[in-house]
Amino acid sequence: MQVTETLSEGLKRGFTVQVPATDIEERRTRRLAELAKTLKLPGFRPGKVPMTLVRQRYGRSVETEVLEETVNEATQTMVSERGLRPALQPKVELVRVDLDQDVEFKVELELLPDITLPDLGSVSLTRLKAEPSAEAVDKALEEIAQRQRNLEPVEEVRPAQKGDFLTVDFVGKTDGVAFQGGTGTDMDVEIAGTGFIPGFSEQMEGLSVGETRVIDVTFPEEYGVPELAGKPAQFEITAKALKKAVAPVIDDAFATKLGLDSLEKLREIVTQQIQNEYDQVSRLRVKRALLDALADQAAFEVPPTLVENEFNQIWQRVDADRKADRLDEDDKGKDEDTLRADYRKIAERRVRLGLLLAEIGRVNGVQVGNDELIRAMRAEASRYPGQEQAVLDFFRQNPQAIDSLRGPIFEEKVVDFVLETAKVDDKFVSIEELNADEDVAGIA
């Protein structure tokens, strides 16, 4: 095999590779002989088919197979012998494919950069932390109690007020004709509550028990029933009972109803849940600070195609948000060229940080264990109730899908390693300070 380097520009490399015709013929003959051993044709005993007939019948398909095998093996050998580390699958272009002559093809690839790791021990960070206050725990308990409210009759005679619940019968009509799904009996409706079409529950305010009222509403344009979307409708409402939502007293009995031994145990669990939420924010903030610090020390060149692929993924989301008028406030008012330039910088930063973290992990032996992958697969499967086994089967049958789980786990383990090596000082602050003016949504 003869290899000639044709391009060496930054991380880009190009080669012309020639494989002798004798090597090709040896492979082809060997493959045809393997076929002949098992080939069964009428008039011939198994394994006794003449080679000329084998070539006539299977020569073309064997040539294709041998060519693909030769190119792949030659490319892998060239990459290995030269100690190259491709960032992506090499691009191959066939130049001469006549198997009776030397096969010639071109290989283009982009290399992973040589990365000099920063002194992780010199990285200094402040990790903001917060602890749940008694007030935060009380508020969380009140929210739990609100979700456990019971409806009780209102004893006084008065019209329905905002926040009350009316038990009603109703009949809905469009163009004077009742429509399917527009009739209800003994339904409890919260006055000005959510979950109804606009104006439905709001117009029940002021109704008294025994009173009937006709209200006019318009179904939203995006309503789930196409026949009703955007159409005006009338509902005849009859009020049958007035109720109010009463939250339970937060005491030991309340905790017992939730399956716990005491209010003290409930407070303990709620406190830990809040602490976990605070710790997640703390983790995201210190991770962002760490990545900012590493980015300042990551001045190496990055493979252009990796950046382009990352940018295309980002831009697909940004462009959809732009067209739907969902851009962040910071991006509104920017023209497309400016947005593209901004997000290309983000893409380059992400690729650079990803390569740096990967190299830190490689050099320091960070690995993702099978038990971690299994936990991740189970966690992903739990997001699809009733389809858990199908999700697990999908992962087992698709190694690339498993790799999509491996990447985030690996990244977090490398971050953990760096945080253990770096100088990290913990600073306790209020939850308001922990949450203040900080984008912790990603690594960009």
Swiss-Prot record:
HAMAP family: Trigger_factor_Tig. Pfam families: FKBP_C (PF00254), Trigger_C (PF05698), Trigger_N (PF05697). One of its GO terms (cellular component) is cytoplasm. InterPro entries: PPIase_dom_sf, PPIase_FKBP_dom, Trig_fac, Trigger_fac_C, Trigger_fac_C_sf, Trigger_fac_ribosome-bd_bac, Trigger_fac_ribosome-bd_sf, Trigger_fact/SurA_dom_sf. GO terms for molecular function: peptidyl-prolyl cis-trans isomerase activity; protein folding chaperone; ribosome binding. This is Trigger factor. Keywords: Cell cycle, Cell division, Chaperone, Cytoplasm, Isomerase, Rotamase. It comes from Granulibacter bethesdensis (strain ATCC BAA-1260 / CGDNIH1). One of its GO terms (biological process) is 'de novo' cotranslational protein folding. It comes from the Bacteria. Consists of 3 domains; the N-terminus binds the ribosome, the middle domain has PPIase activity, while the C-terminus has intrinsic chaperone activity on its own. Belongs to the FKBP-type PPIase family. Tig subfamily. Signal peptide: none annotated. Involved in protein export. Acts as a chaperone by maintaining the newly synthesized protein in an open conformation. Functions as a peptidyl-prolyl cis-trans isomerase. Its EC number is 5.2.1.8. It is found in: Cytoplasm. It catalyses: [protein]-peptidylproline (omega=180) = [protein]-peptidylproline (omega=0). It is an enzyme of class 5 (isomerase). Residues 163-248 form the PPIase FKBP-type domain.
